[in-house]
Design a protein with these regions (language model features):
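Electropositive polyanion-binding surfaces
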Residues: 8-389
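Boundary/activation segment at the start of structured domains
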Residues: 1-2
Length: 389
């Protein structure tokens, strides 16, 4: 996939528009400590007023990278960041990532979705999309905070949580996280009603960390550390449900304005029915939503950047967005992007999985492990989890 190497040509980071208004929120991101491409952040306003507004703020390279530009061509070639244990090959140059990542301590260009809820019933009252600069107060790291932000602790006031050295950044947003967790549980339940069965979080996530080679590309001599993290933690749930709200809401907005986008759909959850990518807004049975795009990771996935351009056109032009959007209905470019993305993204994921297997064997070798107890997991047709020891 990289016949000319993984380096970047000398391309400056384009500057965002100077007339972006400053949002009156204090946002915070929730990511792993290794994440440098911070695409999304959240904010909550109006707690205790009866109407609470959730802000979902997405990094906005699409405000400055023009379709057809050299940076666009570069993104279209790479199509995604490539992840592997101890290393990654980013989709965009580091100068661009650093200019648009949602770093704490500054106001960052963002495409923001604001959803206002009735505080008691959690019914949706209003949705609006804005292009703005968003002050980010904190970059929270879930691997450092999961032991504090538990379901049990979120039911308490932060002053009652009996854990030493709670970071001030977490204290600042504790009440907001408590509301967001309640909202996320509500949203997940609504989707599960549509799905017809609950989502299954039985499989853990495995994190690979390599020691001994700094930030350089691994050469196989590093010491590998593998840690296990249970999926479905409160912070996981908050981030996941917020992303689903944004991706489904913006997908519907594109459809309402007659602006094409790149959608992910699934006709049913019957065995063998796969997720498809297309330019039509169709239901996603697995997610339990009427339509679903990828628009929340524009620093890491080219499809998200394409969809962000279309969302920006809607935010700027409203009912006439279809005339101003970079991609028109039945645009051959969109179909080409989908085809290339699916092939390339699949190859990247296979490469990552292969390297994870290699480093798992390295881990066994380095730790002198010759025999282990294990279990294999698979999902049955009814959605349950089967395990074999």
């Amino acid at each position: 996939n990289f016949p000319k190497g993984t380096g970047f040509p000398a391309l400056p980071a384009p500057q965002p528009p100077e007339d972006l208004p400053l949002a009156s929120v204090q946002a915070y991101s929730i990511d792993d400590s290794q994440t440098t491409e911070i695409d999304d952040a959240l904010s909550v306003t109006g707690l205790g007023s009866g109407q609470v507004t959730l802000g979902i703020h997405i990094a906005a390279p699409g405000l400055a990278i023009a379709p057809g530009s050299d940076l666009d061509k570069l993104g279209r070639q790479r199509l995604s960041t490539v992840y592997m244990p101890g290393y990654k090959i980013t989709m965009l140059p580091d100068e661009v990532v650093q200019a648009y990542t949602l770093d704490a301590g500054r106001a960052n260009p963002a495409v923001s979705l604001y959803v206002t809820y009735d505080e008691a019933s959690l019914d949706v009252l209003e949705k609006t999309t804005r292009l703005e600069r968003v002050p980010v107060a904190h970059n929270l790291r879930h691997d450092q905070l999961d032991h504090i932000v538990t379901e049990e602790h979120l039911a308490q006031d932060i002053s009652q949580v009996q854990i030493e050295n709670i970071p001030q950044s977490l204290k600042d947003v504790w009440n907001e996280l408590s509301f967001l967790h309640k909202l996320a549980q509500h949203l997940k339940h609504q989707r599960e009603v549509v799905r017809g069965k609950p989502e299954n979080f039985s499989r853990p996530d495995y994190s690979f960390r390599l020691q001994g080679n700094g930030k350089n590309e691994p050469d196989g001599s590093e010491t590998v550390h593998i840690s296990t993290r249970k999926r479905g933690s409160p912070l996981d749930l908050i981030v996941a449900e917020a992303a689903i709200v944004a991706n489904s809401s913006w997908g519907q907005m594109l459809a309402d304005f007659g602006v094409p986008g790149i959608y992910r759909s699934q006709a049913s959850m019957a065995p063998g029915v796969k997720v498809r990518m297309s330019t039509k807004a169709q239901p996603h049975a697995g997610m339990g939503v009427k339509c679903y795009t990828w628009a929340t990771s524009p620093l890491r996935r080219y499809v998200d950047l394409v969809n962000q351009w279309q969302v920006i056109a809607c935010a700027r032009h409203g009912a006439t967005a279809a005339l101003a959007a970079p991609f028109k209905p039945k645009d051959a470019d969109l179909f080409s992007i989908i085809s290339n993305f699916e092939a390339t993204y699949g190859a990247y994921n296979s490469y990552q999985a292969g390297l994870e297997r290699v480093w798992t064997l390295k881990y066994l070798e380095q730790n002198g492990i010759a025999e282990i107890d294990g279990a294999s997991h698979r999902d049955d047709a009814a959605g349950g989890a089967l395990a074999r020891a």
